[in-house]
Amino acid sequence: MRRYANLAGAALLLAALWCGPAAAGIFGSSDKSADPLLAADQTVDQIQRAIDDQRYLDAGQALDQALAAASGDQRLVLLAGELSLARGHAEEAMTRFKRVDAVPTLRGRALQGEGIALSLLGRSNEAVAMLQAAVAEDPSAWRAWNALGCEFDRHRDWQKAEAAYSHALTDSDNSPMVLNNRGFMRLSQQRLDEAISDFVAALQKKPDMPTARNNLRLAMAMKGEYSRSVSGAASGDRAAALNNAGYAAILRQDYGEAKKLLDQAMKAKGGYYAMAAANLEMAAALETDSSAGAADVSRR
């Protein structure tokens, strides 16, 4: 099911990552001689908020300044790992987290970061072991629970995934990211109404979350609600919404409707739309095969 959704262009979300250029000096400042001074709690909180708000340039600049003044503060090393992870630099993040995973007050978060990084690197077995260690250390580590849910989901261990997502939702006050991830798992299981409920809840928490909106449209289309699935799509998103609806129609073996939707997607694009063209070709071929199969059965 996930492969199909990828072809359809539906957005997937396992862990929220945004990539950007590293701020100069951040990841080299640890080479300075140890400084016994600690950063102010307010400074640490400001850097964390900047990372949480995806203001990575601000976070990088503030972190660089803090490290210059208090390079001995292990909390800053942890934040450097968090910033690397948020930017998609998993290997670099691993190095940072490993430096502080023996610090008692930081161990839970460091193990969580290592586990998420391992998951992003595709080292699934190691990731699961590390993430389980993280939640054993800190049962409220919701990002570790979310990543565990994603790992179990990938392996179609639905019961464990459901339990992990439940922990993540409880400890994160119903994070929209976790709601979206659980919704996509349920979509994969054809639990369409439950998936739609999760996507709607995610959008209520974060109305500007495109992955949840795209997944909601896909779930509606999978129910055969094609018009509803593309209703309200912005002009720049309409072609993709129609393509996704068309692919959902293919999965439903509704080939005639699929061809109509995919043709509309190509027109809405205003130019060549390779994905919609490939899906249209697939719909036509499957329709031909289906008709031929039906004819064979009728002759028997």
Where are the model-predicted features located?
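Terminal, low-structured helical/coil segments at or just beyond the last alpha-helical repeat
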Residues: 26-32, 235-300
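Helix-start (N-cap) detector for alpha-helical repeat units in TPR-like alpha-solenoids
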Residues: 40, 74-75, 107-109, 142-143, ...
